[in-house]
């Protein structure tokens, strides 16, 4: 998919974290469209719908009610339709066990949620810049 913006989705049950995330993107000088979902069930219902616009980057919180980030990751990785989505786990956990499990399950990157806004903007900017280079260079084929 070639667009002039990067479509980003965040699934996170914490409203403050969702606002922090969208505010950070609104301050970055990167052309993005950001959509958020409250939990894994809501996210997967959207991704599996006929009207879904698949994101280039999907940020998944690990600990969500109904369907957690690992369950979403497994479901996404089991469907070829989602092969081009870069998946970033976005969590408060820095447990090596959690980190290893996410990479073994197919995540592309693991991000520990930053405590301050400037660090969050830097991390998100770096992730999007790497993804943008990947997609615009044709490496995703």
Descriptions of predicted regions:
Residues 64:
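Receiver (REC) domain active-site loop signature in two-component systems and cognate sites
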Residues 56, 84-94:
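A short, hydrophobic beta-strand element within the central beta-sheet of small alpha/beta folds
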Residues 58, 110-111:
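Two-component signal transduction core modules
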Residues 39-42, 68-74:
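Acidic catalytic/metal-coordinating carboxylates
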Residues 12, 60-61, 91:
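Active-site residues of response regulator receiver
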Residues 1-9, 15-30, 116-141:
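Non-catalytic signal-transmission and effector/linker regions of two-component phosphorelay proteins
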Residues 3, 19, 23, 71, ...:
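Alpha4 helix (beta4-alpha4-beta5 surface) of REC/receiver domains from two-component response regulators
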Residues 36-57, 121:
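Acidic, metal-coordinating helix/loop segments flanking the phosphotransfer/catalytic sites
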């Amino acid at each position: 998919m070639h667009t002039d913006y990067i479509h980003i989705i965040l699934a996170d049950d914490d409203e403050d974290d969702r606002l922090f995330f969208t505010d950070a993107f609104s301050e970055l000088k990167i052309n993005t469209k950001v959509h958020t979902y409250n939990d894994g069930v809501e996210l997967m219902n959207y991704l599996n719908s006929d009207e879904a616009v698949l994101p280039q980057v999907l940020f998944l919180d690990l600990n969500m009610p109904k369907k957690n980030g690992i369950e979403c990751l497994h479901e996404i990785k089991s469907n070829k339709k989602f092969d081009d989505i870069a998946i970033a786990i976005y969590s408060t956990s820095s447990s090596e066990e959690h980190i290893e499990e996410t990479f073994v399950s197919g995540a592309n990157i693991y991000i520990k949620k930053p405590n301050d806004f400037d660090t969050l903007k830097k991390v998100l900017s770096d992730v999007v810049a790497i993804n943008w280079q990947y997609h615009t260079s044709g490496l995703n084929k």
